[in-house]
Amino acid sequence: MRLSELHTGDQAVIVRVEGRGVFRKRILEMGFVHGKTITVVQCAPLRDPVYYRIMDYNVSLRREDAAKIEVELISSNATSSPASNDIGEQSANPDSNESIPTNPTEDISAKTKSEIEIEVKPNGHVIRVALIGNPNCGKTSIFNRASGAHEHVGNYSGVTVEAKEGLFRHGDYKIEIIDLPGTYSLSPYSPEELYIRQYLSEETRPDLVLNVVDTCNLERNLYLTLQLKEMGLPVVIALNMFDEFEKKGDTFDYPALSAMLGIPMVPTVGRTGQGLPELFDTLISIHEGRNKIIRPIRINYGSIIEPAVEALTEKINNQLSLPYSLPARYIAVKLLEGDKEMNRFVGEQPKGLFILSARDFALREIDEHLTVARDAESIITDQRYGFIAGALKETYRSSYKQLKTLTDKIDHIVTHRVLGFPLFLLFMFIMFEATFVLGRYPMDWIEAGVGWIGSMVNTFMPDGSFKDLIVDGVIGGVGGVIVFLPNILILYFFISLMEDSGYMARAAFIMDKIMHRMGLHGKSFIPLIMGFGCNVPAIMATRTIESKQSRMITMLVTPLMSCSARLPVYLLLAGAFFPDSAGLVLFGLYFLGILLAVLLARLFKKTLFKVEDVPFVMELPPYRMPTSRSVIVHMWNKAAQYLRKMGSIILLASIVIWFLSYYPRYSEEAVLISQIEQIEGNPQLDEEKKTSQIEELNRKAHIEQQEQSYIGRFGKAVQPVLAPIGFDWKMSVSLLTGMAAKEVVVSTLGVIYTGDSDDSDEAARRLGERIREDRDAEGNHTFSPIIALALMAFVLIYFPCIATVVAIGRESGHWKWAVFSIIYSCSLAWIVSFLIYRIGILFF
């Protein structure tokens, strides 16, 4: 029977895993091994993928991948019993009955002890500690608490996509802590896992490894721990989320497990900092050689595999001179597992080909003793999980409470076949509506404050170019952008809730089938959603996607997700031309970006990238209530980033734009003064007509001044390209300057339109009003609702900001893709805006 044939509520025991390559490797390492109990929890709204529970954690698989797993049904449509009933049961492996050392000192070979002996060498008063653990284990929370940093934390895989370093003092030592990306194993299954293994193996090898473990999911998390021990690394375990474990009511003799594994263990609560002083005291005791618990262990891989491991280990010791301190036994096991990176590494060493030949001979001998359904790789994985299960059998007792947890109840609603998609769309609409509606009130207050400051400066500063620079350049440019800070904070508030609660992983789960049809992986959805905040970290988050082709497609379409930098443009124009339906316009723009991403992904899949079918294997973390500290830190970081941008690139851009629009000065100023004097001295005109005619003269003179300025000439030069889509030279200039950062579009419009009048009350008016009422020399409106829509669509699609282009070039490994993203996005923006404008003027 196949796993894909089971129904919701069914329980089965895994018999074997078929398939090959990365899918089989990853699925085995995630606990899908012989003898483990698995329960079907729920299907996605489109019936694919399927949500399973195994070893006390949740994971999703596509049906086509589940069909590769043979199971034996043990309970049909039954209420799930705790997956923790696997804890304490050895893997039913017929090839070995000696995988579990019941005595802490048993099963350590004197022959191999020297080769995997852990050397903890003091390095002055600085200790380099690598922080490593599974995704969602609270690793970054511990990093933030320990180092005082404010790195973003989230309840989904892929929050940390590069190493972060922090330095702090504890006792007499400085501790340099490196937060590595979350990983399930040390197999090079994804770019981040390869990066971690290279970091731990090469000259960057740390003094100590702090392995953060989710105490509520020990069996799954300890698999990585065993791999770290096999590498000969000095390991300390932080039993994180210990408060949640205590609420479960299970009993856990962690000192006994610590002695059994030879690894010191300290209970911690990362979000509150509980247990961290004791944790770092333990690290220091190991560094100083005072800890009596830490020692090497060796897993016996059974009567068939173990002789091959020992023989290959001996050959490696005798034949290879390795550049790094990797244990020979670890290399032997990896070679027998078929680890491609280890094959490459050994093959590059002197006499490496001899070792690979010996490995091939050993595998042939192993195959002669195995059934068709098993191989060396699966037995090695089984034995590791068997070792873990036996150790937990001695130290862990489950309370066997009802498994219908809060996570199950919430998932029954948010991933429901009928309700899943509508709830997701409703949440997104609420996010955009709240961004505009709730943000409008503080935005009005800030805008009034900016206007008041502009009026005061206009009133009390003496006339001159410096006054114009301050009022039109600095206040008009920077002030026009800073008013949108509350809206951006609200947007990040909702994104933070999605990430920290665990809903982000569910969104990827329900969207996987759609993403799969697009040619993308379900995990691509997470970078795309992250793109609503900022495209740069979203592109970096594509590292979690195993398929190179899917990763490339995701990189290229991620800039179509409307980042927070575009939001000020949308709010400005939507508020000016669609005040009663601005939230709906925002939702439509974000939906347009998603729709274009879908279409382009399919196009890229069929033309540029032949996407291989990579399995969707993704853990669904339990729901957690976002802490106020985490949400506030996330929002504060984004606010600080926004304000830094105000004081740097936007301020500089505003000043440059003001200079370009202010010079050269109007050459006919003397004629204008003469005309004004004639009007004022004309006795046939009343005061109202005099004021009206003088205002009209000033308006035309200002238009001519701007058109003759450097920026006006530049805008006129590029306007013919954008004229077919209804854009005048002012809009053209704002789009060109917006290539640096999308907020500069608003600051450019603020500089250009703030100078439209010398009257302080007029200058203090809302920028949106000035844009809406702007007229050309003939008195025609330069803006209309259709042009505003076309401009917003253009800003959505065209040139990613410089930082995004650089990120695409670096992450893809080829700058040609960065250039390609510029060309295709600008071309697509012109086409879409042309269609909006031309179709719009036919009906409106």
UniProtKB/Swiss-Prot annotation:
This is Fe(2+) transport protein A/Fe(2+) transporter FeoB fusion protein. Residues 1-73 are annotated as: FeoA. Residues 74-844 are annotated as: FeoB. It is found in: Cell inner membrane. The chain crosses the membrane at residues 418-438, 475-495, 520-540, 559-579, 581-601, 646-666, 786-806, 817-837. GTP 2 binds at residues 158-162. Keywords: Cell inner membrane, Cell membrane, GTP-binding, Ion transport, Iron, Iron transport, Membrane, Nucleotide-binding, Transmembrane, Transmembrane helix, Transport. Gene3D superfamilies: 1.10.287.1770, 2.30.30.90, P-loop containing nucleotide triphosphate hydrolases. It comes from the Bacteria. It is a multi-pass membrane protein. GTP 1 binds at residues 133-140. The keyword Chloroplast does not apply. PROSITE patterns: G_FEOB (PS51711). The keyword Acyltransferase does not apply. Disruption phenotype: Cells do not transport Fe(2+). Cells are avirulent and therefore unable to cause lesions in mice. Its main location: membrane. Residues 79-106 have a biased composition (Polar residues). In the N-terminal section; belongs to the FeoA family.
